């Protein structure tokens, strides 16, 4: 597997990702969730991340299209973008019309697959259904709680679950490659994490966007949003290089309006 951001520049604007239908992903969440409480928390988080991922991808595409001598988006990508818009409207309903704008960011070198960003956001945390210490069911007394020591396994468990259920490698990598700001083999070894010693780093722009979007929302109970600064402080616990990488990603993709999103999704904000 290629390592580093350099490989991301040659992404699936050329070869589009093989991804499932929106309805298939929605059915997967319902079939996988062990309880309504688990579904509401995990699927709800994925809806938020899918929304932010789409916003980032769409925003970056608008930045590229506004440049002088910008290339036209291909017909295939344009159709995927329209599909993504329709799916997002189904996900968030009337809130689509009042989604707050993203500020800043850089125009990408190539157009981004907005459908891949949206579907990747919906898929990325499917593995968290398999790291529940208490699953929120009646047998668990309605208590919902994650298994903290094994939570780091959710990406790999989600990846394997998707592959085992016939989903493509393209789809499964959204689950595998979204932890932190990119989890390297070295970090796995140094931190003695219970994972195979490999890189868990985004391999496409769309995977990187989902990884970034994921940092703005937490599946705490109750769930909450995090500002850029709140996640920077969290990233800094693993070293200043980690925090700097986060700020570079924010500069690259822009900053969502977290207060506005929190109001739409009725969640609190950690500033």
Report residues per predicted region:
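Residue-level signal for alpha-helical context at structural boundaries
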Residues: 11, 67-75, 176, 189, ...
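C-terminal/domain-terminus segments
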Residues: 68, 228-245
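Charged phosphate-binding loop/patch that engages nucleotide di/tri-phosphates or the phosphate backbone
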Residues: 239-271
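Divalent metal-dependent catalytic cores for phosphoryl transfer on phosphate-bearing substrates
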Residues: 106-232
């Amino acid at each position: 597997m290629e390592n580093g951001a350099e490989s991301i520049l040659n992404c699936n604007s050329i070869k589009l990702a093989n991804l499932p239908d929106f309805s298939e992903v929605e059915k997967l969440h319902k079939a996988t969730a062990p309880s309504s409480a688990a579904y509401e928390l995990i699927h709800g988080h994925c809806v938020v991340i899918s929304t932010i991922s789409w916003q980032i991808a769409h925003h970056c595409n608008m930045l590229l299209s506004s440049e002088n001598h910008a290339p036209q988006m291909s017909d295939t990508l344009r159709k995927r973008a329209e599909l993504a818009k329709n799916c997002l409207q189904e996900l968030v309903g009337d809130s689509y019309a009042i989604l707050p704008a993203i500020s800043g960011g850089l125009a990408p070198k190539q157009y981004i697959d907005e459908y891949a960003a949206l579907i990747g956001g919906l898929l990325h945390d499917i593995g968290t259904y398999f790291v529940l210490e208490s699953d929120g069911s009646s047998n668990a007394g309605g208590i919902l709680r994650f298994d903290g020591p094994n939570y780091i396994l959710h990406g790999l468990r989600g990846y394997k679950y998707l592959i085992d259920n016939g989903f493509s490698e393209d789809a499964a990598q959204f689950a595998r490659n979204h932890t932190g700001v990119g989890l390297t083999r070295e970090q796995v070894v140094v931190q003695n994490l219970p994972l195979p010693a490999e890189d868990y780093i985004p391999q496409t722009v769309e995977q990187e966007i989902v990884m970034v979007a994921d940092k703005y929302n937490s599946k705490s109970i109750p769930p909450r949003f995090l500002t850029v600064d709140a996640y920077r402080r969290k990233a800094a616990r693993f070293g200043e290089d980690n925090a700097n990488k986060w700020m570079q990603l924010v500069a690259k993709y822009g900053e969502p309006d977290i207060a506005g999103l929190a109001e739409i999704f009725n969640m609190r904000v950690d500033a």
